[in-house]
A protein has these predicted regions:
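Beta-sandwich/jelly-roll carbohydrate-recognition scaffolds of carbohydrate-active enzymes
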Residues: 1-234
């Protein structure tokens, strides 16, 4: 596993980045490299603004010799409301990580347990092909993104059983990290709003932001909540 060698599929409006398993099974290993993101052009979020900061509070007048003063948004450094307002606008809005989708391997499995890794990205087809071995069982994974919709599809072939883990983070608001705050479960929620034998719809609520995630699968499987904002498909 190379934290700088993650691969992505996307369509210009949506992108999904994977590790060597073809999904986002070990995201923490990539958090300091090229993170395993699921992001879209529409997926933005703002933290709560209980102080009611307004954009005009961060404007400052400058005279550039054009016969009139011009207003520009600035980062204020002096302590006080203007600094607090500029700090808030500096991180809001920010792009959302829409969710981690990883293989549900046996408990205790580490990345170092995975061997015989072979992975390629066919840029012409927009397909990631991943092969690896775990506990003597070979896994072959094909990962693609729909050309026109915010949708990914993965095919997993193996004699061993592997489910799918879905974890949803709260955003960090930072500019150079993996966009995942895993220590703020009280600030967002994920609920199953519809489920049948081969599909489910999840509702995500983060402050004033709401979006939905649709899941579809082939064969017999069950989606269940493992813990808050964490679901498993087995």
């Amino acid at each position: 596993f190379d934290s700088l060698a993650s691969l992505s599929v996307g369509n210009g409006e949506f992108a999904f980045t994977v590790d060597a398993t073809g999904l986002q099974t070990f995201p923490s290993m990539y958090s300091k490299g090229v993170p395993l993101g699921t992001q879209s052009q529409w997926g933005w979020h703002s933290f709560a603004n209980p102080q009611g900061y307004k954009s005009e509070e961060v404007l400052k007048a400058f005279d550039f010799g054009r016969g009139h003063e011009e207003l520009y948004a600035c980062q204020f450094k002096e302590e006080g409301r203007q600094k607090e307002a500029s700090d808030w606008f500096r991180v809001n809005p920010h792009r959302l990580h829409l969710g981690i989708v990883g293989l549900g391997l046996s408990d205790g499995v580490k990345a170092s347990d995975i061997t015989d890794i072979r992975q390629t990205l066919n840029m012409w087809k927009g397909e990631i092909t991943s092969h690896f071995t775990l506990n003597g069982n070979a896994f072959d994974v094909q990962t693609v993104c729909h050309p026109d919709q915010d949708m990914i599809s993965a095919s997993v072939t193996s004699r061993a059983h592997a489910g799918v883990n879905l974890r949803f983070p709260y955003p960090t608001g930072a500019h150079a990290d993996d966009a995942c705050n895993w220590d703020a479960n009280d600030k967002h929620s994920t609920t199953i709003v519809r489920q049948d034998a081969q599909s489910a719809v999840l509702k995500r609520v983060l402050d004033e932001t709401t979006y939905y995630v649709t899941l579809r699968w082939e064969g017999k499987a069950n989606l269940a909540e493992k813990s808050k904002n964490y679901f498993v498909l087995t």
